[in-house]
UniProtKB/Swiss-Prot annotation:
GO terms for biological process: L-tryptophan biosynthetic process. Its EC number is 4.1.1.48. PANTHER family: INDOLE-3-GLYCEROL-PHOSPHATE SYNTHASE, TRYPTOPHAN BIOSYNTHESIS PROTEIN. It catalyses: 1-(2-carboxyphenylamino)-1-deoxy-D-ribulose 5-phosphate + H(+) = (1S,2R)-1-C-(indol-3-yl)glycerol 3-phosphate + CO2 + H2O. Pathway: Amino-acid biosynthesis; L-tryptophan biosynthesis; L-tryptophan from chorismate: step 4/5. It holds the Pfam family IGPS. One of its GO terms (molecular function) is indole-3-glycerol-phosphate synthase activity. This is Indole-3-glycerol phosphate synthase. Gene3D superfamilies: Aldolase class I. SUPFAM superfamilies: Ribulose-phoshate binding barrel. It comes from Desulfosudis oleivorans (strain DSM 6200 / JCM 39069 / Hxd3). Keywords: Amino-acid biosynthesis, Aromatic amino acid biosynthesis, Decarboxylase, Lyase, Tryptophan biosynthesis.
Amino acid sequence: MADILTQIVQTKTEAVTAARLRVPEAELKAMAGDRDSKRPFAENLRQVHAQGGTGIIAEIKRASPSRGIIQADLDPADCAAKYEAGGAAAISVLTDAPYFKGSLSDLKQARKACSLPVLRKEFILSDYQVYESAAAGADAVLLIVRILTQTMLSDLIGLCRALGLDTLVEIHDENDLETATNAGAKLIGINNRDLKTFKTDIAVATRLVSNFGPDQVPVAASGIGSREDIERTKAAGIYNFLIGESLVRAEDTVSFLKQLLTT
């Protein structure tokens, strides 16, 4: 890790320490056990992959370190409803506050406004955050290989499984893929953006997918903003995509999403 990623992890570590003082982990565990029925995040994407269709995880994203403010007055509920109307397979919600201006409130509002499964996109480093995700109603969580050891990743995947949470494990290179595979990851997001430099190249996904096992389902993330990008990536055997900025910036979200899904 280096630069912005190191900074994000440090900030997140401090935030979790503070959160533990406000809400004890035992309280979150109890809340996690009382959450609403789970929606099928991983299964939706597996079906798309098996059928060779096109699945889009539509992201609710207010800002990012690389792009700054994308849409300051974004309404999570309205956004989620439009994503569902446009044909998204699932929704991703950024909940990091310092760097992405998101929150767990955004996730709760989005999930309440639609019937789609919702992914919590966060820099998860601890069991505490997994319990927090389940308590907030998330159906799945993002686990980023770059900020976890293999043991941490394996343990977090196991905890998520025990809580009924699906996991999307994010990688960027061959070493990440090896770590994810050894940890038992089946649904794997290939981030075309290098989290160290924030440079984006959609060829990253088309290159790495050739190393996937037959039981692993790839999801391409970052840099996918057009039908051409999707077709190029599908040609390599990737049928699911996580798309954020281009959807948030679209003048007509529903029409743009339907256009991306048009075969």
